[in-house]
């Protein structure tokens, strides 16, 4: 029987690449999204991947959404916490709403999504959780105190939960992408990309969403069962921990 994978923020950008790669690897895949129907509908039509709409910042919405996925596809074996938002501002101009929105989605969202699937993974003695953090959770980024704090929190969550899951066959790992060539990044003016961003990256290029997706597929596999609590940096050498 095929294992079931759920990817949050799974219909666009890195999340879409992850969803597609997991399906190609033989998983039954569900992709959740929060609000972009214009992206989700063609994604479903083009890939055949089931899409579900809910906001990961709401625990109740996550419980309800996960129940729908499991009713349709079966118990979730692989959870990829990819959903995230930005509300950038210099700290002296940042509002409580900007802070809370990012923390609630990018950090609390991991609790909201993982908690409802955790008991089932424990009962089945198998689970794979992959948290998509960020290079900015490792090094910080000016104008992103909220985002950097949330993504750093994702790494602490990963390490703590890995210790709890290890004896039950559950691995918990994180990936910290650097600049990846998503639609959002490629919308940055070419002059800025070529003169300010790419020179920071020793390999001399942006990463590709598929490169992140391939890491996820490996971490979700049986072959990665001895890897847990790890953070994989995928940033072209831009930052070393």
From Swiss-Prot:
Keywords, in A-Z order: Cytoplasm, NADP, Oxidoreductase, PHB biosynthesis
Binding site for substrate: 88, 141-144, 178-179
Enzyme class: oxidoreductase
Entry GO CC: cytoplasm
Residues that, per the record, bind NADP(+): 12-14, 82-86, 177-180
EC number annotated for this UniProt entry: 1.1.1.36
Catalytic activity reported: a (3R)-3-hydroxyacyl-CoA + NADP(+) = a 3-oxoacyl-CoA + NADPH + H(+)
Family classification: Belongs to the short-chain dehydrogenases/reductases (SDR) family.
Entry protein name: Acetoacetyl-CoA reductase
Organism of derivation: Shinella zoogloeoides
């Amino acid at each position: 029987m095929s294992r079931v994978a759920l990817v949050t923020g799974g219909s666009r950008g890195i999340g879409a690449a992850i969803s597609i790669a997991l399906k190609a690897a033989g998983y039954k895949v569900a992709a959740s999204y929060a609000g972009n129907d214009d992206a989700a509908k063609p994604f479903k039509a083009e890939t055949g991947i089931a899409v579900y709409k809910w906001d990961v910042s709401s625990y109740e919405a996550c419980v309800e959404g996960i129940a729908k996925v499991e009713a349709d596809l079966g118990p979730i074996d692989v959870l990829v916490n990819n959903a995230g938002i930005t509300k950038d501002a210099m700290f002296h101009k940042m509002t409580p709403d900007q802070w809370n929105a990012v923390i609630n989605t990018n950090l609390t969202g991991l609790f909201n999504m993982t908690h409802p699937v955790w008991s089932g993974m424990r009962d089945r003695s198998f689970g794979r959780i992959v948290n998509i953090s960020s290079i900015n959770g490792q090094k910080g980024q000016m104008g992103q105190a909220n985002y950097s704090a949330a993504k750093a929190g994702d790494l602490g969550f990963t390490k703590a939960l890995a210790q709890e899951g290890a004896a039950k066959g559950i691995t918990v790992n994180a990936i910290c992408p650097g600049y990846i060539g998503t639609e959002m990044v490629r919308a940055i003016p070419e002059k800025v990309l070529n003169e300010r961003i790419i020179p920071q990256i020793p390999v001399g290029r942006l990463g590709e969403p598929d490169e992140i997706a391939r890491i996820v597929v490996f971490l979700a596999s049986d072959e990665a069962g001895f890897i847990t609590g790890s953070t994989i940096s995928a940033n072209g050498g831009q930052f070393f921990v």
